[in-house]
């Protein structure tokens, strides 16, 4: 399933009266584990990244990892920049 937007995910959650888990991931292994757990629970999931993770790699690399894993997922997955450190980084994430 392709990535969904956080807006879509949160609107569905509001309509369905449920919460969505949001988890920080720093590498491919963490992304895979988070999605696997979400699939076991049959729950949508928000994967978050931080400025320090983006600094270590790149936003494009992290987006590629999450996109590839979301495409194989059986539950909705979205990507969120947690605590963006600058306007420029926030705009890049959009």
Question: Over which residues does each language-model region extend?
Answer:
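N-terminal amphipathic alpha-helix/helix-capping segment at the start of soluble metabolic enzymes
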Residues: 1-22
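N-terminal active-site wall of soluble small-molecule enzyme domains
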Residues: 8, 30, 53-94
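Hydrophobic faces of well-ordered beta-strands that scaffold small-molecule active sites
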Residues: 19-24, 45-48, 77-83
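Glycine-rich, proline-tolerant flexible connector loops at the mouths of alpha/beta enzymes
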Residues: 22, 43-60
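A short, Lys/Arg-enriched amphipathic alpha-helix followed by its capping loop at the start of a domain
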Residues: 37-43
